Amino acid sequence: MIYDFENFTGFLSIPDIHRDVAGYLNLVDGHVRRLIDGGPIVGLQQNLNSLDLKLLHEKFVGDGVMFILQVGGEDEADRSSNIRAFCRRLVYLKNHFSKVNAEAMRFMPVADLPQRIRFGITYGTLIELPRTNGTSEYVGFAINIAARLQKYSGNVSFLASARLPHADKWMTQNGFVKVKATQLRGRPNEFVYIDEVDFTNIKKTKDAVLFEEIALPASPASKK
């Protein structure tokens, strides 16, 4: 999973803001981590429970932050359940990001904070490259896809690859639309899931050409 902020470069260009950026990023990072580890989150009266997701690696990638997660579970159904819950939480956070900014107003010296957070998420095999200092780097196609999804359209705040396990069984039932990302660099035939609200809004903009809606057959369970 990779996330970044709308107009983060502009945020960094505010005069003499750099000493305060760390506090802002740590605040956001804490909320994203609590989506995994559990705990209090903005706008919710009760704490989130922890998910069976292990954070293997976190690093800045350009102007975004990459999380490499190991998905736990006894079988594919368990792993799918963990990813489903994580996706729901990511969408919740992006929908309530203004509350994170309201929290940041307590210590930030300026009001012009990034207005939106954007997520790109996928699933796949990565290769671990151990380093002599005891840390590891990771490489693999999944990282490339997540980065491209997160940057694909500035008007979209959440894109999930259809490579997520069993995504076809739960994404469209939970407020997502399956579309083809027609101009995704290197993979113009990649299927992705987009938040239904985002998709409705983007169809009214010039970025509508970035997505091709597909007609899905009715699932066997829905046939009478």
Regions found by a protein language model. Name each.
Residues 149:
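Extracellular/oxidizing-compartment recognition motifs
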Residues 82-101:
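Extracellular-facing segments of soluble proteins and assemblies that are Gly/Ser/Thr-biased and enriched
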Residues 143-144, 185:
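C-terminal or late-domain output modules
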Residues 1-88:
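Catalytic NTP-binding/metal-coordinating core of nucleotidyl cyclase/transferase enzymes
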Residues 6, 124-126, 144, 163:
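Alpha-helix/helix-capping structural signal
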Residues 154-224:
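Intrinsically disordered, glycine/charged-rich C-terminal tails and inter-domain linkers
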Residues 43-81, 99-141:
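Catalytic core of nucleotidyl cyclases, primarily class III adenylyl/guanylyl cyclases
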Residues 11, 68, 129, 167-168:
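Residues that scaffold the ATP/ADP-binding catalytic core of kinase and kinase-like folds
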